[in-house]
Amino acid sequence: MAEKHAVLVDIDGVLTLSWKPLPGAVEALREIRGAGLGVALVTNTTSRTRASIAGVLTGAGFPVTADDILTAPTVTAAYLARHCPGACCALLNSGDDIREDLTGVRLTGYDDTGSDTDPGADIDVDVDVVIVGGAGPGFDYAALNRAFGQLQHGARLVAMHRNLYWRTDDGLQLDSGAFLVGLERAARREAEITGKPSAAFFEAALAHLGVAAGDALMVGDAIESDVLAAQRAGITGVLVRTGKYLPETHRAASGSPDHVVDSFADLPALLGLGEGAPSAQQ
């Protein structure tokens, strides 16, 4: 493998599981940073803000700051500013309040100061864009049906990702991609995807680090949206056998990863770091 100057890393299922560090992940990231490689944590997580994610990770011992983290919401905000400036947007998302990462996005259901208004007040508002984030309790029938109605009235459909599921301590859990398929079919509208696997997401990560695609490596547990999508963008892909990894998904994938390792703890050796590593990257 040619020498790399930067590493893009998915968080959930690669560094952590249910926000708890996976074995060896903290030490591996410290070693990578200590070797002087650039690091960007790239995640489709929509349940937490960048600041919240950074707080959890640093509390667990990971050497990261909020500036190291690129999330689907932050990329979505940039996408909307470029393609839908000033649009009135309805957000369908579960988890923490992520408005601080949606800088410049005008959301229904909030006044000019950002305070909550009547949660049902946006039903009859002319919505320009429906934004689909991550699944959870907020993905109830009423919320989905309201989004369906807004799409029927001409709103654009923008989704932060297409993830069908993610893994927690309780096993695989449904994610918003499963519901997005239904919205697309019912409304006869194809979603514009802003997070992984969109090329724009990886381009934003490379720009954030100031490196070319050939100088970077992407590590993920989702073969299609993390690894193969990165490879299409010219980035070397590494699949880990943790998180949502399933052998059957690996076998049925549309392509092959450049590299497969058991876990993120194996990455320093793959990069040629440490005493037990190869003398040169192959």
Annotate each predicted stretch with a short phrase.
Residues 1-11, 16-37, 46-70, 77-282:
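Asp-based, Mg2+/Mn2+-dependent phosphohydrolase catalytic module
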Residues 40:
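Conserved glycine-rich Rossmann-like NAD(P)H-binding loop of the short-chain dehydrogenase/reductase
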